[in-house]
Amino acid sequence: MSDSEQNGSNQNTGETAEAHAERAEAAEQQASTPEDKLGEAQAEAARMREQLLRTAADFDNFRKRSRREVEEAQRRGREAILKDLLPVFDNLERAASHAESAPDAKSVAEGVRIVTKQFVDTLDRMGIKRIAAVGKPFDPSVHEAIQQLDSTEHPAGVVIAEVQPGYMLGDYLIRAAMVVVSKGSPVEPAPAAN
C-alpha cells in the first residue's frame, strides 16, 4: 500500500472514528435522558399550566370589567334620559296642580298642549320618532292590526285609525303602533235570482 493510500485510509478511519464517537455520545445521551426528558416535560407542563391559569384569570377579569362597563354605560344612558324627561314631568306636575285651582279648562288644556310639545321635542332630541300610521299602507313590521273595518273612503290594507302610537329609536322598533285597518268597500251580496 502506498503512503497516500494509507493516509486516505487513516483519514477515513479518523472520520469514521469521529462519527462513531459522536454516535456513541448521542446514544449515551439518549440512554441517560428518559429521566431528563421526563423532568423537562414536567417543567414544560408546569409552565403551560401556569400560563393557562394566568390566561384564564385575565379572561375572567376582562369579562368582569366588560360587564361593569356595560352596566355603567346603561346607567349613564338611563341618567341622560331621566335628565331630559324630568323637566317634562315637573311641568306635568305644575299643570296638574294648576288644573285643581284653574277657573277654566281652556288654560289647563293649553298647559297640557305645551307639556306635550315639550315631551315630543325631548323624544325627538333622543332620536325617538313616532311611527306614521293613519292613511299609510299597513306595514306589519311597524303596525299591529287590532281590528279591520269596511271602509268606502279607504282602499283595503290602509290604516284608518290609530289606537295607540308606535315609536322607533333610529331603525329599532320600540313599540308597534296599534291600528285599525281598512278591508275596503263592503261587498254587497248579489240579488237573488227568482
Curated annotation (Swiss-Prot):
The gene is grpE. Residues 17-26 have a biased composition (Basic and acidic residues). It is found in: Cytoplasm. Gene3D superfamilies: 3.90.20.20, Head domain of nucleotide exchange factor GrpE. This is Protein GrpE. One of its GO terms (molecular function) is protein-folding chaperone binding. Residues 1-61 are annotated as: Disordered. Homodimer. SUPFAM superfamilies: Coiled-coil domain of nucleotide exchange factor GrpE, Head domain of nucleotide exchange factor GrpE. GO terms for biological process: protein folding. Residues 1-14 have a biased composition (Polar residues). Pfam families: GrpE. GO terms for cellular component: cytoplasm. Participates actively in the response to hyperosmotic and heat shock by preventing the aggregation of stress-denatured proteins, in association with DnaK and GrpE. It is the nucleotide exchange factor for DnaK and may function as a thermosensor. Unfolded proteins bind initially to DnaJ; upon interaction with the DnaJ-bound protein, DnaK hydrolyzes its bound ATP, resulting in the formation of a stable complex. GrpE releases ADP from DnaK; ATP binding to DnaK triggers the release of the substrate protein, thus completing the reaction cycle. InterPro entries: GrpE, GrpE_coiled_coil, GrpE_head.
